Curated annotation (Swiss-Prot):
It is found in: Cytoplasm. Interacts transiently with the RNA polymerase catalytic core. One of its GO terms (molecular function) is DNA binding. Residues 135-205 are annotated as: Sigma-70 factor domain-2. This is RNA polymerase sigma factor SigA. One of its GO terms (cellular component) is cytoplasm. Residues 71-83 have a biased composition (Basic and acidic residues). Belongs to the sigma-70 factor family. RpoD/SigA subfamily. Residues 303-356 are annotated as: Sigma-70 factor domain-4.
Length: 368
């Protein structure tokens, strides 16, 4: 590995830079030096989600500015972070037989030279389906290498590989060898895009738009950088200052980024309790309130029993004592077959009786 390559790998990327900022930096450097390496492009853009238009536009800009894409001297086809020759399982991930067989199978497929890629691309332009399959098969290792970087984000390793393969197929269909860049460089963005979109769509209980996923990822990078610089968790105001966002927007993004937690999550060493057991139901009555309510019902029933049947039933309907639905004077009048004025008179008489100290004192303690 050359000294220049080591320098590229150790450079730190300002987490506050936008995709356009980084693309401009690359183009400015390419215009100055006349070339850019595939490895440097991959390193600089690795944290951004680029759609097909952005990818094609970027490579078009490189061509328009006569910037040549080259390999790092003495480097492999990709840097150490994306190594298609490494088909081992990601750290901490146990692979089952189907995955092991798949990795073994794609490991038998020979990688392509730059000239072979061009020859296949020419045949693909002519509609050769066999050439499409050959180019895709030769880059399945690349998908595995990229998929490893997304393990632990809510999707199984094999699912990540399958989504990445879909991105690889799109890259095969859209690759334009005449622009001068390697297929692996171009395919990397398609593979990453397919995987990140799948994570946004499938891995979260609540779906987050892809553009918001990129914003969340950027915020997390800024948050981690500030944590290192400050030695403490940064405040929303500090994050907002770095990202040029108001604190309210930062709080909103942080809230969106939170993952839902199941109420069935086991709690304790014995896993005999669940998270939901320790969360208060704000709508449920406390035992003391429930006891007081039941006692009030008993006292109210006793007081109503001192009225005539008609007076009691009128109050029950007017105040919804039985079903919680209050009725108008007219509605109650229809029930008893009398006028609304007559119901008003019965209600007034019944309430006067309830206000008598002999009855009201029994309910007075419940008025607080």
């Amino acid at each position: 590995m050359s000294d220049n390559q080591v320098k590229i790998k150790k450079q730190t990327i300002d987490p506050t830079l936008t995709l356009e900022d980084v693309k401009k930096q690359l183009i400015d450097k390419g215009k100055k030096e006349g070339h850019l390496s595939h490895e440097e492009i991959a390193e600089k853009l690795q944290n951004f989600e680029m759609d097909s238009d952005q990818m094609d536009d970027f490579f078009d800009q490189l061509n328009d500015n006569d910037i040549t894409l080259v390999n790092e001297k003495d480097s492999s086809d990709t840097d150490d972070k994306i190594n298609p020759n490494d088909l081992s399982a990601p750290p901490g991930v146990k692979i089952n037989d189907p995955v092991r067989m798949y990795l073994k199978e794609i490991g038998r497929v020979n990688l392509l030279s730059a000239q072979e890629e061009i020859e296949l691309a020419k045949r693909i332009e002519q509609g050769d389906e066999i050439a499409k399959s050959r180019l895709a098969e030769a880059n399945l290792r690349l998908v595995v290498s990229i998929a490893k970087r997304y393990v632990g984000r809510g999707m199984l390793f094999l699912d990540l590989i399958q989504e990445g393969n879909m991105g690889l197929i799109k890259a095969v269909e859209k690759f334009d060898f005449s622009k001068g860049f390697k297929f692996s460089t171009y395919a990397t963005w398609w593979i990453r895009q397919a995987i990140t979109r799948a994570i946004a769509d499938q891995a979260r209980t609540i779906r987050i738009p892809v553009h918001m996923v990129e914003t969340i990822n950027k915020l997390i990078r800024v948050q981690r950088q500030l944590l290192q610089d400050l030695g403490r968790d940064p405040a929303p105001e500090e994050i907002g200052e770095e990202m040029d966002l108001p604190p309210e927007k930062v709080r909103e993004i942080l809230k969106i980024a939170q993952e839902p937690v199941s109420l069935e999550t086991p709690i304790g060493e014995e896993d005999d309790s669940h998270l939901g057991d320790f969360i208060e139901d704000q709508e449920a009555q406390s035992p003391s309130d429930h006891a007081a309510y039941e006692l009030l019902k008993e006292q109210l029933e006793d007081v109503l029993d001192t009225l005539t049947d008609r007076e009691e039933n009128v109050l029950r309907l007017r105040f919804g004592l039985d079903d919680g639905r209050t009725r108008t004077l007219e509605e109650v009048g229809k029930v008893f077959g009398v006028t609304r004025e007559r119901i008003r008179q019965i209600e007034a008489k019944a309430l006067r009786k309830l206000r008598h100290p002999s009855r009201s004192k029994r309910l007075k303690d419940f008025m607080d």
